[in-house]
C-alpha cells in the first residue's frame, strides 16, 4: 500500500525472485546494493530532517528548557503584554493630586496615545526631581491685555485633560463587552481562521483599552470638579491662607490658588513646535537654546532599527535586507528638531519663585511674591542634560530583539534551504526512474554528473550553523543580562 519495505522483507523478496530472474549474478548484486544504499539514504534523510527541525524549533524557543512553548505559555505571555499596556495607560492618566510647581506628571493629551511610548516612571521621577518641566495645561491663545481676574477665570475653566473622541472610526462596530471582565474570548468569532482570530483579539483589546482610558480619566475629572466646588463652597481663597487661628488642620485639595494661577500664566510663552501657550520656565535644547514643552519633548526618540543607508552603486547588484547581516542593524540618536544637531538633549532650570505640589508647599497655599524665593540649599539647582534615551532606556533591548528576530528568520531560511537540497523530490524521482530502467547504466553515468556536496558535508554545515547560532544567542543573553544589571538602581 505504498509503505517502504523493511530490510527483512527486501531479502525475502529477493529470494523469491532470484530463480526466475533474467539478470546475471553481477546484475543481481548491483540491484541489492542499490536497495541497501536507498535504505541507508532514508536513515540519513530522517537524521538530517531531525537536525533541520531541531534548528528550526531551537531558534524559536532557546530560552525554554523544553522542546517548544506550549499554547498555554504563549497565551500567558500575550496576557502579560496586555497587562503591561494597561499599566502604562494608567500611568498616563492626569491626576489632580499629582502636581509639581503648578504642572502635572502626565501629559494633557496634545498627541495620540500611540506616540506616548516613553517610560512613564522615568519621566515622573525627572519631573518630581525638577530636572524636567512638568506637563502644564496649555492655552490655545494668550492676550496680554487680559486683566488678572480675566486670566484667572480662563485658567479656572481649563480641563484636567483634553477631550477624547468617543466614536473613533478605527473602533467602529468593534465589540468591547464587559470592561470589568479581564477576558473577552466570547467576543471573538470562532468561525474565523486562527490568524483572523488573533487580529480580532488585538483589535478588541485596543478598543477596550481606549474605552478604559476614557473611563479612568473621567473619574479623575469628576474628582477634580468636585474639589473645585468644595473649595468654593467653604470659601477657601488665597486671601484666607494666612489665617491660622483654627487649630484644625486644613484639608489639602491639591488645587492651585488664584495667585498661583496668575503667576503661572502671566509670563508664559508659546512652544515653537505645537504652537500652544504654556507657563514657564520651558525646557531648552542644549545645542541651540530653543524652548520646547515637555509634551513635544517626549515625542522625540531614536529612529527605528534599520540597516545603514549605504550609497547605491549602479554597477553592483543591490542586496536585499533579508540577505544582510542582522548585526549591522543600527538606530541613531535623535537629532535636534531646530538645528538638526545629533544626539539631541535638553536642560531645565526649575522656577525660583514657586515650589509647590510634590516636594513643596500645597498648591492652594501659594501666595504671589514679587521677589524670587531663595532655594533652601542656598545654591543653584543641579542642571543635567536629558536625552530621548533617558526617557526610553529600553532602546538597546529593542534593537537587540530586532537583530535576534532577523537572525532567527535568516537561520530558518538557511535550514529550509539546506533541507530542500537534502530532500529533493525531483531528484528522487529521477533516481528511482533510472533505477527501474537501467541500474547498471545509472552507475556508469553517475560519474559524469556535476559534483554536489555529500550528505555528510551538508550535515556538517548544518551542525556548524547550529553551533554558531547557539553561541550568538548565548552571547546576546549574556549582554542583555549585564545591561539589565547595570540599569538597576
From Swiss-Prot:
Keyword Cell wall biogenesis/degradation among record annotations: no
This protein's record includes keyword Cytoplasm: yes
Modification Phosphoserine, positions: 13, 436
GO BP terms: cellular response to glucose starvation
Compartments where located: Cytoplasm
Regions of compositional bias (Basic and acidic residues) in chain numbering: 461-477
GO cellular component, one term: cytoplasm
Compositionally biased region (Polar residues): 21-32, 51-69
Keywords: Cytoplasm, Phosphoprotein
Region listing for Disordered, in residue ranges: 1-84, 419-489
Modified-residue entries (Phosphothreonine), positions: 183, 433, 438
PANTHER family named among the record's database cross-references: PROTEIN SIP5 (PTHR31315:SF1)
Note: Present with 556 molecules/cell in log phase SD medium.
Assembly notes: Interacts with NPA1, SNF1 and REG1.
Functional description taken from the UniProt entry: May negatively regulate the SNF1 kinase by promoting the interaction of the REG1/GLC7 phosphatase complex with the kinase. Deletion of SIP5 promotes resistance to artemisinin, which is probably an indirect effect of an action on the electron transport chain.
Name assigned to this protein: Protein SIP5
Name of the coding gene: SIP5
Amino acid at each position: 500500500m505504498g509503505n517502504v519495505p523493511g530490510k527483512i522483507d527486501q531479502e525475502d523478496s529477493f529470494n523469491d525472485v532470484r530463480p526466475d530472474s533474467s539478470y546475471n549474478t553481477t546484475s543481481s548484486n548491483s540491484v541489492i546494493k542499490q536497495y541497501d544504499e536507498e535504505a541507508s539514504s532514508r536513515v540519513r534523510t530522517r537524521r538530517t530532517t531531525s537536525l533541520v527541525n531541531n534548528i528550526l524549533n531551537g531558534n524559536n524557543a532557546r530560552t525554554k528548557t523544553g522542546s517548544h512553548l506550549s499554547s498555554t505559555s504563549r497565551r500567558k505571555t500575550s496576557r502579560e503584554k496586555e497587562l503591561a499596556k494597561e499599566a502604562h495607560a494608567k500611568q498616563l492618566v492626569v491626576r489632580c493630586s499629582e502636581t509639581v510647581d503648578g504642572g502635572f506628571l502626565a501629559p494633557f493629551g496634545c498627541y495620540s496615545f500611540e506616540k506616548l511610548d516613553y517610560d512613564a516612571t522615568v519621566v515622573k521621577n525627572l519631573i518630581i526631581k525638577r530636572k524636567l518641566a512638568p506637563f502644564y495645561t496649555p492655552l490655545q491663545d494668550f492676550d496680554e491685555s487680559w486683566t488678572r481676574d480675566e486670566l484667572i477665570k480662563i485658567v479656572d475653566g481649563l480641563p484636567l485633560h483634553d477631550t477624547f473622541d468617543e466614536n473613533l472610526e478605527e473602533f467602529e462596530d468593534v465589540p468591547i463587552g464587559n470592561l470589568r471582565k479581564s477576558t473577552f474570548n466570547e467576543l471573538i468569532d470562532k468561525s474565523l481562521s486562527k490568524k483572523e482570530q488573533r487580529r480580532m483579539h488585538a483589535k478588541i483589546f485596543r478598543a477596550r483599552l481606549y474605552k478604559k482610558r476614557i473611563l479612568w480619566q473621567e473619574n479623575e475629572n469628576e474628582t477634580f470638579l468636585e474639589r473645585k466646588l468644595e473649595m468654593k463652597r467653604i470659601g477657601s481663597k488665597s486671601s484666607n491662607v494666612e489665617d491660622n487661628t483654627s487649630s484644625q488642620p486644613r484639608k489639602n485639595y491639591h488645587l492651585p490658588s488664584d495667585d498661583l494661577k496668575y503667576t503661572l500664566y502671566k509670563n508664559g510663552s508659546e512652544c515653537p513646535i505645537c504652537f500652544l501657550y504654556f507657563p514657564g520656565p520651558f525646557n531648552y535644547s542644549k545645542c541651540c537654546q530653543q524652548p520646547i514643552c515637555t509634551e513635544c519633548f517626549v515625542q522625540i526618540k531614536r529612529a527605528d532599527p534599520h540597516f545603514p543607508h549605504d550609497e547605491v552603486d549602479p554597477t553592483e547588484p543591490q542586496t536585499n535586507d533579508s540577505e544582510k547581516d542582522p548585526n549591522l542593524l543600527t538606530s541613531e540618536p535623535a537629532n535636534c528638531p531646530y538645528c538638526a544637531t545629533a544626539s539631541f538633549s535638553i536642560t531645565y532650570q526649575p522656577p525660583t519663585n514657586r515650589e509647590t505640589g510634590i516636594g513643596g508647599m500645597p498648591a492652594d497655599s501659594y501666595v504671589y511674591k514679587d521677589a524670587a524665593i531663595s532655594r533652601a540649599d542656598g545654591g543653584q539647582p543641579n542642571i543635567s542634560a536629558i536625552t530621548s534615551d533617558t526617557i526610553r532606556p529600553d532602546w538597546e533591548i529593542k534593537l537587540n530583539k530586532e537583530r535576534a528576530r532577523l537572525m532567527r528568520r535568516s537561520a530558518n531560511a538557511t535550514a529550509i534551504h539546506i533541507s530542500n537540497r537534502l530532500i529533493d523530490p525531483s531528484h528522487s524521482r529521477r533516481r528511482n526512474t533510472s533505477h527501474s530502467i537501467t541500474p547498471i547504466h545509472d552507475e556508469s553515468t553517475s560519474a559524469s554528473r556535476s559534483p554536489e556536496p555529500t550528505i555528510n558535508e551538508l550535515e556538517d554545515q548544518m551542525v556548524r550553523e547550529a553551533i554558531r547560532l547557539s553561541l550568538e544567542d548565548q552571547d546576546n543573553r549574556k549582554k542583555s543580562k549585564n545591561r539589565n544589571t547595570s540599569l538597576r538602581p
